[in-house]
């Protein structure tokens, strides 16, 4: 039965961002949000409210575990059928894993308590990793990079690692570390929030540490300077993955 009351549904999805101009819908460029909205309008209602994502990924950035919510008038929506139809409709580089009814107070962006990103650095040239990992051939000191990563933990002003100015640049970074898997160096970072371009700039600055262009004291000074021009280069977007978003346990996702 359809009523005037809107009911909220959560979508869990993954996407390869190489051919998209980020998550947020744009007039003249393909985006993840735009593609999903086309599908919802086609299968549900042209007047469906805008789908809301867990964050605004930049152009070229990928997501392994991304969440979004939308509202619809019918709480008895056949989510299995919609899941099947959307996956047939959407391009191959976007996949919907699940669609579930969720409580009305849930918000894909503002209910999140943390987000985790991973950045992939390939130490070996690999044609199958084009637009999926950053190839870097020089040897890096992973131990030094992890010592520097540990300095990021806690409530930190992260304005040194962002292109944009914020009234509040404090981020609560809960974990930050590097690990190696075969020919891949992977940087993992989890925080309650991220500033624009923050992860890519942190990775570039940590690479400078690994190359011994800067030492640990320099890295501390960069953090405390609150000045983007003191930090290192921003690595390419295509090596960055939003790997997870965490929500309070009361939301069964």
Identify the meaning behind each predicted range.
Residues 1-253:
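Structured-RNA-binding interfaces characteristic of tRNA pseudouridine synthases
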